[in-house]
Amino acid sequence: MPDLDDPCPTPVTRVQQNLLAASERRLLTWLCARMPNWVTPDLLTTIGMIGAVMVFAGYTASNLGDAWLWLAIGGYVVQWFGDSMDGSLARFRKVERPSFGYFIDHSCDGLANLLIMAGIGLSPFVRLDVALFALAGYLLLSIHAFLSVRVLGEMKLSYIAAGPTELRLILIALTLVMMAMGSTPGWFGDVSGFDLFIGGVGAILLLLFLVQTLVASRRLLAIGERD
């Protein structure tokens, strides 16, 4: 769920009710005011993608040793910085490119999410099919957000008080638990506790998509949209 500009010329309401939204916005505004001129939104988008590659590399390399997970944790920080700052800096400097920014940002988000979840699935801690199931749930919610912009004029950046930043913090905490517990078999044989956690998150995301789709459909019917 990105932080760039609205794709439509008509006003779009940004729905952002995650727990850290206000604190994060203050931090981003503080950082924007101190960014040197050579730091551009495009550079920050690139930095965000570099962070996603770091996460992928850290998880996949953890097959060689748990210490590589520190690279994944560092990648989350880099990815947050680039992904959160690119749109914020564009708006701060009033150099928005609404259509281009929206298209590139969401395209990069999709690739970054794939890198992160594929990395988790290629690690010794989580099965690939479980990680890809969670990715599917996240991408379905992203699709819902994109559709809401078009049909409701709303950009949903959070669900149940959680957004991308909260999800990154959860994944960082999970990665620290991976380092502490190792990749030994769990109580359920081939299915580890990490599989259950990631699979559970995926199930929640899928359920949220279904509920939000139902809610949006009822809203559209109420305002006379019957395509």
What do the PLM-derived regions correspond to, one by one?
Residues 1-73, 119-227:
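Hydrophobic alpha-helical transmembrane segments
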Residues 74-118, 144-148, 214-215:
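Acidic (Asp/Glu-rich) catalytic motifs at the cytosolic membrane interface
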